[in-house]
Swiss-Prot record:
Catalyzed reactions per annotation: an N-acyl-L-alpha-aminoacyl-tRNA + H2O = an N-acyl-L-amino acid + a tRNA + H(+)
Keyword line: Cytoplasm, Hydrolase, RNA-binding, tRNA-binding
Annotated protein name in UniProt: Peptidyl-tRNA hydrolase
Single Gene Ontology BP annotation: rescue of stalled ribosome
Length: 193
């Protein structure tokens, strides 16, 4: 097993803390809480911490550049640790997945997600692993207000179960590789018992 940069995308500040667009930050916060890890070291234009799993150290990164400039932070971390882009795992919200689903994917486009766009612009390509946290699409209205809006209380109540499912996926990915994790988890809805 080798080191990874696990970057959760979001916007800094209490105003954005519980918004749909901060699913990546919320994911890393849940991991840090459950694993008793601190993500508070100021580095790489973000907040960083270390998580050890199966005798391997992984860097947890919450860019503090705002979403549209997340690529700068991810690039700095990869360069510092001399890791290829394939060792980056980016956790982000995804409008195209229904709430309650989490999927793994390697490569692809940015799908209009400004954080992914920034990473691809900074690094020249999109060949990194994505852990996509489904937030669903708004029934009406524009997507900007939707992603920057807070989750309703009924979704907030369910969020830990979804994030815990995503953590299971991440652990499987790190322990047994992407194909195995995708085959076991990509068709699962974490709201179903």
């Amino acid at each position: 097993m080798s080191m990874h940069i696990i970057a959760g995308l979001g916007n800094p500040g209490s105003h954005y803390q519980w918004t749909r667009h901060n699913a990546g930050f919320l994911f890393l916060d849940r991991l840090a809480h459950l694993e008793n890890v601190s993500i508070t070291r100021k580095s790489f234009s973000g907040l960083a911490g270390e998580w050890s799993r199966a005798n391997c150290r992984h860097i947890l990164l919450k860019p503090q550049t705002f979403m549209n400039l997340s690529g700068r932070s991810v690039m700095q971390a990869l360069q510092f640790y001399k890791l290829p882009l394939s060792q980056a795992i980016v956790v982000h919200d995804d409008l195209d997945l229904p709430f309650g689903t989490v999927r793994l994917k390697q490569g692809g486009g940015h799908g209009g997600h400004n954080g992914l766009r920034s990473i691809m612009e900074q690094l020249g390509k999109g060949d990194f692993i994505r852990l996509r946290v489904g937030i669903g699409r708004p029934l009406h209205g524009d997507t900007v207000n939707y992603v920057l809006g807070s989750m309703p209380p009924e979704q907030m109540e369910l969020l830990p179960r979804i994030l815990d499912g995503g953590l299971e996926m991440l652990e499987m990915l790190l322990d047994q590789g992407l194909p195995k994790a995708m085959s076991l988890f990509n068709n699962r809805n974490f709201l179903e018992k």
